[in-house]
Amino acid sequence: MRHALFLMILFLSLSCTSRSQARRDSINTLSDTLSTPDSIMSADTLRLLFVGDLMQHQGQINAARTATGTYDYSACFEYVKEEIGSVDLAIANLEVTLGGKPYKGYPAFSAPDEFLTAIHDTGFNVLVTANNHSLDRGRSGLERTILLIDSLNIPHAGTYTNAEEREKKYPLLLEKNGFRIALLNYTYGTNGIAVTPPNIVNYIDTAIIAKDIEVSKTLHPDAIIACMHWGIEYQSLPDKEQKFLAGWLLQKGVDHVIGSHPHVVQPIEVRTDSLTNDKHLVVYSLGNYISNMSARRTDGGLMVKMELVKDSTVRLNNCEYSLVWTAR
């Protein structure tokens, strides 16, 4: 049975307001403040897109297997490929290892190599890899995943073979259209599996994150974006820790926060700095992007687009989201 992603709503120009009734009154919106003046047309523009969890459960692996024993995922992304290709940077959470055979789904994921090839061919050009499944195949799985991502020249953040590699490549600096973006990535844990030295998984530790933010600032980025694997699974609202960390990250100098892990969509906020009037996007959870999960609200998620413009300053000019649904 094939698994394919469908766009439910394209280009929802709602300025990233959440439609969650329980949160509607507490969401700051950009509908009045992010109109696009003519002067912006001459400014440099960077379009980013974020999606949630790229997963491979056993049903998906079985469905992708061909008669020749290879795996074909092209049909999974055919309806979203155009949307992915419309942006400058498309960033996704790779929530599987590429640990080699035997290929397995939950609870210890190891996806076929062809899954990564399909992700790359769809247009995703940045991956974050720090999540609770990073160590599902131990040291060999972590290192093989990094090796394969590097073989396709896909920039990535979150897991590293050793401290030297982390120091060299982290924070991940993305340069596009004259912009410099520092990308950070952390996870709450790895399902109780301890990382094997010298490998490194970026865990959520405020002391370490604070240092990483300061290193990011030395790179003179136009924006610092933190991708956080956090929260409680299947909960439609962020918990206290998510709310605290989001505020703390912004206070420390992060410009935008993008969350994953709950497997369901959680609210989006746009916060305004009272001193600078800068706009900061907080997405508590993008939900799933592609999976075989059957629990309520886990069969889809968000694709969130944000547009940065730069003239005399860098600012969030617009944001919007599309809904995706996995047909199976």
Predicted segments, located by residue:
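Positively charged n-region of N-terminal signal peptides that target proteins for export
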Residues: M1-A4
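C-terminal motif of bacterial Sec signal peptides marking the signal peptidase cleavage site
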Residues: L14-S15
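Acidic, metal/ion-coordinating pockets
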Residues: R19-R328
